[in-house]
Amino acid sequence: MVRMPCSLYMREPHSHRRAGPLGALGTRRSASSEGSFQSEGPTRPMRTRRRRFRIAFRVAKVLLVIVVLFAVAVGLLFLLTPSAGQATALVRAQARDRHITYPGPPVPAYFAQALVATEDHRFYSDPGVDPLAMGRVVISWITGREDQGGSTIDQQLAKNLYTGGHSGFTEDLEQLAMAVKLNQTYSRPQILRMYAEVAYYGHGYYGLDAASCGYFGRPPDRLTLVQAAMLAGVVNAPSYDDPLVYPRQARTRLVHVIGRMAAVGYLTRAEETAALNAPLGLSAVRGCA
């Protein structure tokens, strides 16, 4: 028997790893398939951004619809609310009920400056309402919370004259409409004078004349800067800032008012310092001599 060499039965080492055309093609296909799998579709951060954008867009559309409906409601109220031409008659009626005279003395410059600086620093340029106030009313309606934002002087006057001092969604809408009407009907000095006469100053005093005589024993035209600033500041929270009952709170409020007058340019820093160091001069005797 002839024996064959062993080498004929042995495979060449690593011959099974040789990459033929099909093997190379298969390798390339695998790499291609892997690459296409990795690039298939947007990445997760991109999908998250798109989802957030869609949500924000939907929320914006809902808010836009609410604002449009709100504007329509204000427009209807503008047509349905009474004329602002009767405002002076309403002020006179309130003054008569409280045994005070309207029109009273002119509003002193210091009082007007302090009131505008603290309550409505755009009083001489705004249309009677703060554009942001409309948004606050909508938010308060959606959340069910009372609007704590600041109101213009025209809005506060409308609140006192037309809604009985009450607040609520419909009352706030009416106040916005009437504030615009008041702004279109009366001059700025007339608005200030009406406001000064119907405002409550605490301690039972309605009207600037009664408050000036009650707290300081002098008419409004003789008020000092610090006295006028105190009266302008107390109308925001008359029961809480009553200087005869809560002098510490009244002092804090006075410092704020004086600071606002300086911030908007009515007072220099030297005048601000002098006012903060000036005596308030509360009278022990109620009423003007």
Where are the predicted features?
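Juxtamembrane regions of bacterial inner-membrane/periplasmic proteins
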Residues: 2-289
